[in-house]
């Protein structure tokens, strides 16, 4: 079960963000952006001189149970991107994508 699902554009603005407890919506929005800052710091450190390879480690990014959720989300995102009426960079407003996210959030693993 997911508590928050976000799709972030390459330019760091949200294309889609949804959280289960709606009263914590701003908190999750903040957490998504701060986690992106950690990834940006690790990537920018790669360009600097002689970086210790252990410093680039972000942690286990795909536990087995989370891999299925990511695959389902990625397949649905690919369907949105392949829609000829979707303009890349616009907010995701697909009903099918929203239904898939809803099913992921209420699904008990």
Curated annotation (Swiss-Prot):
Subunit structure, interactors included: Component of the multisubunit TRAPP (transport protein particle) complex, which includes at least TRAPPC2, TRAPPC2L, TRAPPC3, TRAPPC3L, TRAPPC4, TRAPPC5, TRAPPC8, TRAPPC9, TRAPPC10, TRAPPC11 and TRAPPC12. Interacts with the heterodimer TRAPPC3-TRAPPC6A.
Pfam families, per the entry: Sedlin_N
InterPro entries (UniProt xref): Longin-like_dom_sf, Sedlin, TRAPPC2L
ATP-binding keyword on record: no
Organism phylogeny: Eukaryota, Metazoa, Chordata, Craniata, Vertebrata
Similarity annotation: Belongs to the TRAPP small subunits family. Sedlin subfamily.
Subcellular location field: Cytoplasm, Perinuclear region; Endoplasmic reticulum; Golgi apparatus
UniProt entry tagged with the keyword 4Fe-4S: no
Swiss-Prot/TrEMBL GO biological process terms: endoplasmic reticulum to Golgi vesicle-mediated transport
Keywords: Cytoplasm, Endoplasmic reticulum, ER-Golgi transport, Golgi apparatus, Transport
Protein name: Trafficking protein particle complex subunit 2-like protein
Xref: Gene3D superfamilies: 3.30.450.70
Highest taxon above the source species: Eukaryota
Function: May play a role in vesicular transport from endoplasmic reticulum to Golgi.
GO cellular component: endoplasmic reticulum; Golgi apparatus; perinuclear region of cytoplasm
